[in-house]
């Protein structure tokens, strides 16, 4: 509509909004809200990140890219689907530019123990988390396992546990902690790697491998992928291993992807909330809808509906409550 009255306009009192003000030719131009459409650009998957350089796989091969300025705060991680412009030749010294990051189906993240509010995204768009633990030397860590599982379930990932060195110790008591949880368990020996069943579980999926140093993760990754990642020994005094992976890296399988991550001895749960975990236990979540507001869903919690007779297997309920306590302890430390 023009700023002049047109025939048929309803008359009204004039005010300052009816005055047309000529724009100041020396003033700054208003920013447009329109953004470029990058959907037609070539697409790739981030394979690894090294400082500000991203190795990206496109349909024409592997290239090196950097992030567009407006994406630097968000950042891209291994597994991200990204849209590219610039030099896509992949020649030595060439550099493409990541101008858009596609929607993330899943996002695995952690926080450092001393930075509870600073979450670190690790891998995007993965399907499952493979947790590698040794039956002995070093001993399995139930606290770390619970953190891995809580993060996986809250992120929408399936979980796999791979127990190595089962020829040294079977760890039956440790594995009893997992009764009732939706997790596949595989076992390997130091003297032989029978990986047929494990490979079937990895087929057609993007699987993130995690585990602290010395459990045999790099050796296992080498056997599965045919790569030659460095492996490390366990210190006889401390019982701890040396980190042999320095950054997350996506490695192709025959039908799928294996994403190796650096070994860590801590895995902070960052800002994951109780409701995030409940989303992975739909049968339990349905019952907790009847719980009083603010219910902690523990055995000692008064009026908790989970304490009434129900069809949830006791082992599954106990495992859920153990994971929930891990989250509650983390939330308490953040206060």
Residue ranges and their predicted role:
Residues 42, 61-65, 229:
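Short beta-strand segments
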Residues 61-78:
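Beta-strand/loop nucleic-acid-binding surfaces
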Residues 39-50:
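Structural detector for short beta-strands of small beta-barrel domains
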Residues 1-12, 18-21, 37-40, 74-82, ...:
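Helix-rich effector regions associated with P-loop NTPase G domains
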Residues 52-56:
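Short aromatic-glycine-enriched beta-strand elements
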Residues 158, 165-215, 226:
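Canonical P-loop GTPase G-domain recognition
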Residues 118-186:
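Phosphate-binding glycine-rich loops and their immediate beta-loop-alpha structural context
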């Amino acid at each position: 509509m023009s700023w002049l009255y047109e025939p048929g306009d309803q008359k009204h009192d004039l005010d300052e909004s009816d005055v047309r003000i000529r724009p100041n030719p020396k003033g700054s131009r208003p920013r447009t809200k329109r953004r470029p459409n990058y959907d037609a650009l070539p697409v790739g998957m981030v394979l690894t990140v090294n400082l500000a350089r991203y190795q990206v796989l496109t349909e024409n091969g592997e290239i090196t890219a950097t992030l567009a300025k407006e994406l630097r705060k968000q950042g891209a991680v291994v597994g991200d689907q990204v849209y590219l412009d610039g030099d896509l030749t992949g020649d030595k010294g060439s550099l493409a530019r990541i101008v858009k990051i596609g929607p993330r189906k899943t996002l695995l993240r952690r926080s450092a123990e001393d930075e509870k509010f600073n979450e670190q995204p690790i891998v995007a768009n993965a399907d499952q988390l493979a947790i590698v633990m040794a039956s002995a030397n070093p001993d399995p860590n139930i606290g770390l396992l619970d953190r891995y599982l809580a993060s996986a379930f809250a992120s929408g990932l399936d979980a796999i546990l791979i127990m190595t060195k089962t020829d040294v110790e079977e760890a039956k008591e440790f594995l009893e902690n997992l009764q009732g949880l939706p997790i596949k368990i595989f076992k390997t020996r130091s003297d032989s790697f029978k990986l047929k069943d494990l490979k079937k579980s990895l087929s057609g999926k993007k699987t993130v491998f995690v585990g602290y140093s010395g459990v045999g993760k790099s050796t296992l990754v080498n056997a599965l992928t045919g790569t030659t990642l460095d492996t490390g020994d366990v210190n006889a005094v401390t019982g701890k291993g040396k980190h042999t992976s320095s950054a997350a890296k996506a490695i192709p399988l025959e039908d799928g992807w294996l994403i190796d991550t650096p070994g860590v001895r801590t895995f902070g749960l960052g800002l994951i909330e109780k409701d995030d975990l409940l989303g992975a236990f739909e049968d339990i979540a349905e019952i907790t809808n009847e719980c009083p507001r603010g219910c902690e869903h523990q055995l000692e919690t008064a009026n908790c509906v989970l304490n009434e007779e129900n069809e949830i297997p006791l082992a599954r309920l106990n495992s859920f409550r153990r994971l929930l306590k891990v989250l509650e302890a983390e939330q308490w430390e953040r206060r």
